Amino acid sequence: MVPENRRKQLAIFVVVTYLLTFYCVYSATKTSVSFLQVTLKLNEGFNLMVLSIFILLNSTLLWQLLTKLLFGELRLIEHEHIFERLPFTIINTLFMSSLFHERYFFTVAFFGLLLLYLKVFHWILKDRLEALLQSINDSTTMKTLIFSRFSFNLVLLAVVDYQIITRCISSIYTNQKSDIESTSLYLIQVMEFTMLLIDLLNLFLQTCLNFWEFYRSQQSLSNENNHIVHGDPTDENTVESDQSQPVLNDDDDDDDDDRQFTGLEGKFMYEKAIDVFTRFLKTALHLSMLIPFRMPMMLLKDVVWDILALYQSGTSLWKIWRNNKQLDDTLVTVTVEQLQNSANDDNICIICMDELIHSPNQQTWKNKNKKPKRLPCGHILHLSCLKNWMERSQTCPICRLPVFDEKGNVVQTTFTSNSDITTQTTVTDSTGIATDQQGFANEVDLLPTRTTSPDIRIVPTQNIDTLAMRTRSTSTPSPTWYTFPLHKTGDNSVGSSRSAYEFLITNSDEKENGIPVKLTIENHEVNSLHGDGGEQIAKKIVIPDKFIQHI
């Protein structure tokens, strides 16, 4: 909102400008004997300055009125974008206007103001696409999007740009032989307004892409609603409220996956392709105007800028396509067994919040984009979700470790699952009973953890099973696993049911001395209330007291 004092100042300025303009026209008319003499007096000195201010004021008021009619109230972000781009556009327009003779002053001023105002309208319309997408809710339909104010403004601006281009081209053919300099003027205007038309083409393609995504989501929602059926009650005592509960058909979980629409896959890559296409059209237009028609060398900066932007957009599009192909070919597809043995026990994709595997018996995927893929750091995500994430960021969405190296290749994995680390040795305890060490390794699931606190405390009285459960729920899996060789001690007596193993814990670079750790396994006989005897196994890790400190 404009402050009250600013409104008063604007009103005074408008009144003074109109009074001065009326005075200049009246004085020039009273002191002249012909219309030609009136125009000559108005084009010099103080009269010219007043008329210029009058034209700028009225064009600004007209622009404000048209903005109010076409777009309504402008948002704060739209005002910011206008003021960010406006200074450079004004300077560029002034430089282009200085290329022509002063006798074309009013023609250049007219086309300059018209071009400036239409550029502002195009900026606002581009921002309105984002506002339109953000306003979509459950009651929005495709019909309301197509017949919205945004679509009307898009068609209106396209028609205006086309009409201006055709008028300029007709003027070129009319003045081609009589006035060559005016031909260059109209050629530049044709080029500038064609650039605006290409921007509208870009916006139109982006709009079609977003509308298609909305249509797909509506179709997916409709199919999901059609999939819900009402069960027929078979019991006479069934409560009426229970009869109205919808029952889902017991179909294959892959069909449910296909019905769920989580966004248009590769949308970011399609947007990049549209930008590359329109940038190529702009570059070709600048080159076609610069070389054959010998346009001013000031256009060379636009050609260089377009070529650089085209190169950057093309390189970005190629990198996105190459990375998406590597994600599918290089990353490992996780099976049900690997997922069950991994540290990712929640079976949830962190991006779409959907299950990675819906059924324990699922071995294949009808929708290949829903295959769970393991990143080099060990985290598991859907392939489609991973592609959408990698289009904007080259790091893992959970731990932020890089997925691609400096050469653009997938980094070498440092993750090793629990199922890959097994021990085939057989240990005989003090009672003479052989124990399968591999089965023990499956019971004690030691998970690698990462902590963000520099104060790492070792709690010697903590139970191993409780510690493992807490590690799964609160810690993030580390990208590196370390194995420690176990050595059975010989201090176990014959009548004891205790087995002990000693090993050393060291850091990754092994520059410091290791910490001796002892793992003890005790078997206890437990008598239940019914008289049944059982055996309980207690596992405990013992660390000397002198090593219990901040590491």
Curated annotation (Swiss-Prot):
Residue numbers spanned by region Interaction with USA1: 517-551
Compartment(s) of residence: Endoplasmic reticulum membrane
EC number(s) reported in the record: 2.3.2.27
Zinc finger (RING-type) residue numbers: 349-400
Ranges that cross the membrane: 9-30, 44-71, 85-101, 104-126, 148-169, 184-208, 272-292, 297-314
Entry function: E3 ubiquitin-protein ligase which accepts ubiquitin specifically from endoplasmic reticulum-associated UBC1 and UBC7 E2 ligases, and transfers it to substrates promoting their degradation. Mediates the degradation of endoplasmic reticulum proteins (ERQC), also called ER-associated degradation (ERAD). Component of the HRD1 ubiquitin ligase complex, which is part of the ERAD-L and ERAD-M pathways responsible for the rapid degradation of soluble lumenal and membrane proteins with misfolded lumenal domains (ERAD-L), or ER-membrane proteins with misfolded transmembrane domains (ERAD-M).
Protein name per its UniProtKB record: ERAD-associated E3 ubiquitin-protein ligase HRD1
UniProt source species: Saccharomyces cerevisiae (strain ATCC 204508 / S288c)
